[in-house]
Amino acid sequence: LRDAENFDAVVAAGGDGTVASVAYLLAETGIPLLPFPAGTANLLAMNLASPAEPHALAHLMREQRLMDFDIGEIELSNGERFGFSMIAGAGYDAAIMEGAEPSKRLLGPMAYFTAAFANFAPQFSRITLTIDGKTVETQGVGVLAINFSKLQFDISLVHENLPRDGMFDIVVMNTHDAVGLIPAILSCMLDRAGEFPSRP
């Protein structure tokens, strides 16, 4: 991407990880990014309603049908930095992503469900969050920083989600095991209006 400024736009063909990496490198350059869904989940392309056909993608660019969205940055303890555009997770979510990696090519999106069922008793941890200068102490099996919230089957992790407001939605999986997540998952599936008491 060193010569990206010489082009009118950049097409990132791949899954969410590939697209997020390219988006992070192009952040604040003003160069349009066109995500072409060629990975396992392609959730960012789905949230953006990005077409899966090259001609249609080129048509979007010609018409300048573009939008800005937020990019998150993660810095590891060793100083390494990388970005995310959809969701960043620690704990159970990260374990699912890692567990799904070997079987994604064979199983596709089902690899994530298989990895989740294989780790039905994730580690329960104390969680310390610093949000806008305020420290929050909580506990659970994981925490998510959400930019775009829509997953497969038109399920949204949070009800009111604005990926262009300069903020992330933070969700703590406040349970001792995966079974405790079932009510929240069902409410996300059944209650699209956000009226269910357990709805994030």
Residue ranges and their predicted role:
Residues 17-18, 143:
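Conserved Motif II region of HX4D acyltransferases
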Residues 27-145:
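Catalytic core of DAGKc-family lipid kinases
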Residues 93-96, 137-139, 151-154, 178-182:
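Short acidic/glycine-rich loop or secondary-structure boundary segments that cap or lie
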Residues 12-16:
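N-terminal glycine-rich "phosphate-gripper" loop used for MgATP/nucleotide binding
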Residues 1-10, 20, 24, 28, ...:
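ATP/NTP phosphate-donor binding region
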Residues 131, 137, 162, 172-200:
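ATP/nucleoside-binding phosphotransfer catalytic cores, i.e., glycine-rich phosphate-binding loops
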